[in-house]
């Protein structure tokens, strides 16, 4: 695993662009390393089910002998989570060797491959939309902590609420 700094604006737009750590708007992420040989992992557009190229942010889908089969007694949730199929693959796909009709696990994790390593940027369910722009809660929390010495890092949380909370 390694730490890499990305252009925060481009990352929010779904593109991983590496920058120096001291660049304005740089956002640091630590990789999860490479994918185990027994596992296949692809980054997919969660709306279309199409595989995305390295450097694009999408949902991680997994396939392998160590992936569960489903949720006990919850067939609908099992189909939604463990029954995904790739709508389109890239040339030299990370799904190479996996049959086209194979079921994939939708992890709900967002991230990308960059430099051959896997980076997780957040969770789909945690993503917030402000003025039509996708925002990670961690970014809001870091901005609040950086805004004032009175706010301690790790003591701020951002989340959505069904109604306006003031």
Predicted regions and their residues:
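Hydrophobic, Leu/Ile/Phe/Ala-enriched alpha-helical segments that form helix-helix packing faces
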Residues: 1, 55, 144-148
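Gly/Ser/Thr-rich phosphate-binding loop
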Residues: 1-26, 40, 47-51
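Alpha-helix termini
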Residues: 18, 86-90, 148-153
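Conserved ATP-binding/catalytic segment of the ANL
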Residues: 29-42, 47-55, 59-130, 134
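C-terminal boundary motif of the adenylate-forming
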Residues: 108-110, 127, 146-166
């Amino acid at each position: 695993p390694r730490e890499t700094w990305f252009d925060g604006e481009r990352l929010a737009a779904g593109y991983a662009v590496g920058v120096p750590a001291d660049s304005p708007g740089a956002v640091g992420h630590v990789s999860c390393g490479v994918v185990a040989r027994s596992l296949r992992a692809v980054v997919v557009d969660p709306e279309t089910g199409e595989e995305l190229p390295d450097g694009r942010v999408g949902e991680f889908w997994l396939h392998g002998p160590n992936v569960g089969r489903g949720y006990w007694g919850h067939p609908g949730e099992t189909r939604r989570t463990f029954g995904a199929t790739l709508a389109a693959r890239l040339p030299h796909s990370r799904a190479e060797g996996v049959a086209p009709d194979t079921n994939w696990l939708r992890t709900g994790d967002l991230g990308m491959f960059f430099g051959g390593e896997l980076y997780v940027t957040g969770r789909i369910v945690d993503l917030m939309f402000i003025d039509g722009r996708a925002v990670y809660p961690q970014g809001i929390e870091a901005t609040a902590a950086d805004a004032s010495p009175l706010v301690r890092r790790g003591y701020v949380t951002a989340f959505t609420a069904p109604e306006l909370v003031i």
